[in-house]
């Protein structure tokens, strides 16, 4: 099931979470993710590192697509977030890894909310 939210960020739900515990602005979230370009080229993966990623959501610590997309997931949920350039790294890109204005695809699993 696909849902398109703010910024044309698309959420494709892969497997459900608990359906009750959703992150709120400022919450510390623990996430496993793999990020790819639209062509499938992987640029980053917490799964490959064997260490989940933590951040405070909704406060500008991560790309805007995560700040608007992650709060739509409940703990345990796995989803694919497709994030257009303006809600990813925009015209700067990420030199050496992500070309300017790239749409990014993240397979994410929300492990924990604190």
Curated annotation (Swiss-Prot):
Residues 26-114 form the PPIase FKBP-type domain. Signal peptide: none annotated. The gene is FPR1. Its EC number is 5.2.1.8. Keywords: Acetylation, Cytoplasm, Isomerase, Mitochondrion, Phosphoprotein, Rotamase. Disruption phenotype: Resistance to hydroxynorvaline, a toxic analog of threonine. Double knockout with THR1 is lethal. Changing residue 43 to Y: Reduces interaction with FAP1 and resistance to hydroxynorvaline, a toxic analog of threonine. It is found in: Cytoplasm; Mitochondrion. The modification N-acetylserine is found at residue 2. Changing residue 44 to V: Abrogates interaction with FAP1. It comes from Saccharomyces cerevisiae (strain ATCC 204508 / S288c) (Baker's yeast). This is FK506-binding protein 1. Belongs to the FKBP-type PPIase family. FKBP1 subfamily. It catalyses: [protein]-peptidylproline (omega=180) = [protein]-peptidylproline (omega=0). The keyword Phosphoprotein applies. PANTHER family: FK506-BINDING PROTEIN 59-RELATED, PEPTIDYL-PROLYL CIS-TRANS ISOMERASE. One of its GO terms (cellular component) is mitochondrion. It is an enzyme of class 5 (isomerase). GO terms for biological process: chromatin organization; negative regulation of homoserine biosynthetic process; nonfunctional rRNA decay; protein folding; regulation of chaperone-mediated protein folding; regulation of homoserine biosynthetic process; transcription by RNA polymerase II. PPIases accelerate the folding of proteins. It catalyzes the cis-trans isomerization of proline imidic peptide bonds in oligopeptides. Plays a role in feedback inhibition of the pathway synthesizing the aspartate family of amino acids by binding to aspartokinase. GO terms for molecular function: DNA-binding transcription activator activity, RNA polymerase II-specific; macrolide binding; peptidyl-prolyl cis-trans isomerase activity; protein folding chaperone.
């Amino acid at each position: 099931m696909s849902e398109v939210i703010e910024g044309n960020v698309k959420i494709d739900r892969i497997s459900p979470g608990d359906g009750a515990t959703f992150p709120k602005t400022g919450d510390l979230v623990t996430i496993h993710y793999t990020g790819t370009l639209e062509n499938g080229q992987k640029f980053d993966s917490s799964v490959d590192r064997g260490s989940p990623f933590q951040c405070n959501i909704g406060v500008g610590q991560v790309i805007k697509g995560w700040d608007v997309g992650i709060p739509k997931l409940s703990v345990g949920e796995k989803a694919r977030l497709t994030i257009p350039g303006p809600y990813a790294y925009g015209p700067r890109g990420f030199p050496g890894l992500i070309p300017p204005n790239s749409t990014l695809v993240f397979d994410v699993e929300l492990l924990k909310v604190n």
